[in-house]
């Protein structure tokens, strides 16, 4: 039976590694009755290298740390002014395949940007969301025990320069773009509020419960 309630945790600015380990712990200890959660967060500057990542795609990290992680995909950058959203979803209970969850996440971003008259789209061969061949959102998931963790990163109002130190998602010369430059949401808070709406609608959640911080 599909969960009707989505619990949303507003985490603010949190370091990447502790958030990642908290996601792992939640996923490893959840059972068939555990609630689905959506974590809303920003991270200090960090490069994360997914399981498909190749070291040659990290060109010049400089003073920004590089963390090897257990999500799908290749290297990406997180930093202040970027909305990061982690869906901790029991896909088995929600009767979703992995591909459908990815499609739903991408569509929730596309729908949110459409609210601002931004024409965004997904690519079948390169997960994420794009505007005129520039990437505005990255996506990388891990499924364990039939449940998802990791998630999406939407560029809102950030310094995009660190993306030039890597081949984003393994694509040399891939240009990044952000919401603020396109007349989209101007703050991470605004983008998060809108994305919560579109994601919950697409996923069919009837009730949203908001929390500040992680569970005690």
Curated annotation (Swiss-Prot):
The record marks 135 as: Lowers pKa of active site Cys. PROSITE patterns: BPL_LPL_CATALYTIC, LIPB. One of its GO terms (biological process) is protein modification process. It holds the Pfam family LplA-B_cat. The keyword Methyltransferase does not apply. Residues 32-207 form the BPL/LPL catalytic domain. InterPro entries: aa-tRNA-synth_II/BPL/LPL, BPL_LPL_catalytic, Octanoyltransferase, Octanoyltransferase_CS. Pathway: Protein modification; protein lipoylation via endogenous pathway; protein N(6)-(lipoyl)lysine from octanoyl-[acyl-carrier-protein]: step 1/2. One of its GO terms (molecular function) is lipoyl(octanoyl) transferase activity. The active site is at 169 (acyl-thioester intermediate). In the reaction, the free carboxyl group of octanoic acid is attached via an amide linkage to the epsilon-amino group of a specific lysine residue of lipoyl domains of lipoate-dependent enzymes. Catalyzes the transfer of endogenously produced octanoic acid from octanoyl-acyl-carrier-protein onto the lipoyl domains of lipoate-dependent enzymes. Lipoyl-ACP can also act as a substrate although octanoyl-ACP is likely to be the physiological substrate. Belongs to the LipB family. This is Octanoyltransferase. The gene is lipB.
């Amino acid at each position: 039976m599909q969960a009707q309630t989505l619990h949303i945790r507003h985490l603010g600015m949190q370091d990447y590694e502790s958030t990642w380990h908290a996601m792992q712990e939640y996923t490893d200890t959840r059972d068939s009755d555990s609630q689905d959660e959506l974590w809303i967060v920003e991270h200090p500057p960090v490069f994360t290298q997914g399981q498909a990542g190749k070291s040659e795609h990290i060109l010049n990290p400089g003073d920004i740390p590089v963390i090897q992680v257990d999500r799908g995909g290749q290297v990406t950058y997180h930093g202040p002014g970027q909305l990061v959203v982690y869906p901790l979803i029991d896909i088995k209970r929600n009767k979703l395949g992995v591909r459908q969850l990815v499609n739903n996440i991408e569509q929730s971003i596309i729908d949110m940007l459409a609210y601002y008259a931004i024409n965004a789209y997904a690519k079948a061969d390169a997960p994420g969301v794009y505007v005129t061949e520039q990437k505005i959102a990255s996506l990388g998931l891990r499924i364990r025990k039939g449940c998802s963790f990791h998630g999406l990163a939407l560029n809102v109002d950030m310094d995009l320069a660190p993306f030039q130190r890597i081949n984003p998602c393994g694509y040399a010369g891939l240009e990044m773009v952000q919401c603020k430059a396109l007349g989209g949401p101007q703050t991470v808070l605004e983008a998060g509020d809108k994305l919560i709406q579109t994601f919950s609608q697409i996923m069919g959640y009837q009730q949203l419960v908001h929390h500040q911080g992680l569970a005690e």
